[in-house]
Amino acid sequence: MNFNRHVVVTGGSGFLGINLVRYLLERGWKVSVLDLEPCRPEFATRIHMVIGDIRDPDAVRQAASGADCLVHAAAALPLQDSATIRSVDVDGTRNCLEVAQREGLSRFVHISSTAVYGIHDQLNTCENAALDGMGPYGRAKAEAEIVCRKFRSPDFAVAILRPKSFIGPERLGIFGLLYDWAADGRGFPLPGGGNHRFQLLDVADLCHVIVQALTSAPEHANRTFNIGASEFGTLKSDFQAVLDYAGFGKRVLRLPSSPAGWMLGLAHRLGLSPVYPWVFRNLTVNSAVDITRARNLLGFHPSYSNRDALIRNFEWYLRHRDQWRRQTGITHTVPWAQGLLGLAKRLF
């Protein structure tokens, strides 16, 4: 592919964005970022930063000027209200596509989610499986994919990536609960005990395949791809690796699924727990996708297993833990306020 290696990253100040911008800069790309939040200080003199909303055509145009391609990683989060989720994830995606096409960009990589499949007790889900998005977030992501497919052409390739839950340096959010409990010498309870296989993904592997989607032949990239780890065990065994690494001799513990689900659901509705129903239900079934298409067309060969990715993320957490002690929020880059879970932690 013949271009100047100038890429726009929407959502460049989020968890994926931080890792992707760093990955691209290390490999000689010119990077422009569009985000509501400023970039990390380490990037300030190395990128073109545009503070703005992906729903604003002028902001997207300013970021896309002179670029060859765009990675659309900006998205509303599942904890936000349904109207905001749809506006950002559907209307924002459409706006980015329209501007990118008008500005003459040749490649668009849309970061979707396996949430478009809904929650099914299934391994090796293929890209042609029926879409059954769970909740406002999953439904909006599925609708955004429909928008993306309408823009595909030989001159404007639109790759849709559906990553599993991805982790690594800078990731906190729901995984911050596990790391906090492990670092404090606590066991970790899982509804149902975690005796099912659950595929994750290291953010470094996701960054690698994004670049593959940017640089592969259009006839290969102009498709939809599942992205996940190739090596993973049960949720119990993979989470236990974090507790073992912490070195306190603690174990993953089983909570009865139905009572735990009822209590967590009530606590979330009352604003006393960050664990929303989709997370709970997703953690109680087998969940993995088939990555054969990405392997064959994009050369995707994940370097990290679930355990590798979890330990790598936990090591980063331990190095940076002090800076997060008084910060909470709803994004993936800060700890979530534990609410009642912080009190329950004392029991384990």
Sequence positions of predicted segments:
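Substrate-positioning beta->alpha
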Residues: 95, 143, 171-177, 192-214, ...
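Mid/C-terminal beta-alpha module of Rossmann-like enzyme folds, strongest
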Residues: 216-275, 291, 311-312, 324-326, ...
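C-terminal amphipathic/interface module of NAD(P)-dependent oxidoreductases
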Residues: 275-348
